[in-house]
Amino acid sequence: MANKPRTRWVLPYKTKNVEDNYFLGQVLGQGQFGTTFLCTHKQTGQKLACKSIPKRKLLCQEDYDDVLREIQIMHHLSEYPNVVRIESAYEDTKNVHLVMELCEGGELFDRIVKRGHYSEREAAKLIKTIVGVVEACHSLGVVHRDLKPENFLFSSSDEDASLKSTDFGLSVFCTPGEAFSELVGSAYYVAPEVLHKHYGPECDVWSAGVILYILLCGFPPFWAESEIGIFRKILQGKLEFEINPWPSISESAKDLIKKMLESNPKKRLTAHQVLCHPWIVDDKVAPDKPLDCAVVSRLKKFSAMNKLKKMALRVIAERLSEEEIGGLKELFKMIDTDKSGTITFEELKDSMRRVGSELMESEIQELLRAADVDESGTIDYGEFLAATIHLNKLEREENLVAAFSFFDKDASGYITIEELQQAWKEFGINDSNLDEMIKDIDQDNDGQIDYGEFVAMMRKGNGTGGGIGRRTMRNSLNFGTTLPDESMNV
């Protein structure tokens, strides 16, 4: 009878079974070498992620060593806030389990796909985090070797969630001057010296430069119909800055990209030098462009509306989907620089100045006053949405019906002055001119507003107008259609 194969172990010590301490739940993700589960600590109820690696996929001692090194590197970097924190590791006869911090916001890659590309200020913030991770790795003697948007997770679904690095499966410890020859990484992000099989930590800066390029335009700098074609483009090192949106992107941003995607690793910026580059350091050099003339135009149109129409727009804004208001939510956060939840006069003025608006302070003050329906002195999120949603939302009948029904409290088919007084009270608004407003809308002079009169009021004076920049937010980076379906590993 043949002897059973001896069980091999990754960890140098015996552990409990992972299920002694945790309940394993739903599958969160499936990778080439393992499956990630939601797990819950049995005593504390804390929710974490558990990456389980089947030992049957570890074919030789080198594979076992690689898993151990991944665990060691995660512990080594665990104090850095933008690295996914490992809690503990477990091993049984069939699997190795890495229990780590749960990041519920999804991959950076998915957000790029959803948004198309980022503003310069947002891209600068993200790349500062990414290169900060690179600097932390290098300062601690680690080369990541597989930096890509798929390996960065957001801590939550909030737009301002922390970005954290994960998946150190290809990472290695290194000493100063040490060179590697193993061909690893992912095709779009691999540095030329990796293709030449003689490289060091500089390869991570190249990969981060590719990510920055994608953040700003939505597509990678080097791509072709085949993996070999991609490698050929990488070795040629020619960057494309002629097509949109590059003509409108600052020279400082392009300067940084050129220095990160320098083909000679000895001339390439270090991670620390990237973090000291003016585009990263100076907000004025890496400008956000949160507003354009269309926003000013919409605020002006909003200022000319009566309060019923303003309130109806707010009701409509509150029922729109996240997809529809996603761009405006971003815009609000960009303007609300102190994250107070309201936009002050100074914040509105600063935002307009950043995009070269020449409105006088008195005009900006008037726009704020018009949007500030509850007269609090600032614009809250609901007021901002109401003032800036595209007026084509008024072409959708279901939106108008919903808004009318909000004011028609008794569902009589008419809005009365008493119902308006009740609505005004709900919104915290004082207005003694309701009689005059009803007269302006009430075409048959019966003292109340029917649905037809309400629709006429809502659609009166609405131009088609331009976009607020949401077109770019909805562009899709889809490597399966726009680009070759080749986001494979090298």
UniProtKB/Swiss-Prot annotation:
Entry protein name: Calcium-dependent protein kinase 12
Enzyme Commission number(s) from the entry: 2.7.11.1
UniProt domain comment: There are 3 contiguous domains conserved in the CDPK subfamily: a kinase domain, an autoinhibitory (junction) domain and a calmodulin-like domain. The autoinhibitory domain (286-316) inactivates kinase activity under calcium-free conditions.
Phosphoserine: modified positions: S186
Residues covered by the EF-hand domain: 323-358, 359-394, 395-430, 434-464
Residues at which Ca(2+) 1 binds: D336, D338, S340, T342, E347
Activity regulation: Activated by calcium. Autophosphorylation may play an important role in the regulation of the kinase activity.
Quaternary state and interactors: Interacts weakly with DI19.
Similarity-based family: Belongs to the protein kinase superfamily. Ser/Thr protein kinase family. CDPK subfamily.
Organism: Arabidopsis thaliana
Residues binding Ca(2+) 4: D442, D444, D446, Q448, E453
Residues forming the catalytic site: D146
Residues given in the record as Ca(2+) 3 binding sites: D408, D410, S412, Y414, E419
One annotated GO molecular function: protein serine/threonine kinase activity
Keyword line: ATP-binding, Calcium, Kinase, Metal-binding, Nucleotide-binding, Phosphoprotein, Repeat, Serine/threonine-protein kinase, Transferase
GO biological process, one term: abscisic acid-activated signaling pathway
Function: May play a role in signal transduction pathways that involve calcium as a second messenger.
PANTHER family: SERINE/THREONINE-PROTEIN KINASE
Binding sites annotated in the UniProt record for ATP: L28, G29, Q30, G31, Q32, F33, G34, T35, T36, K51
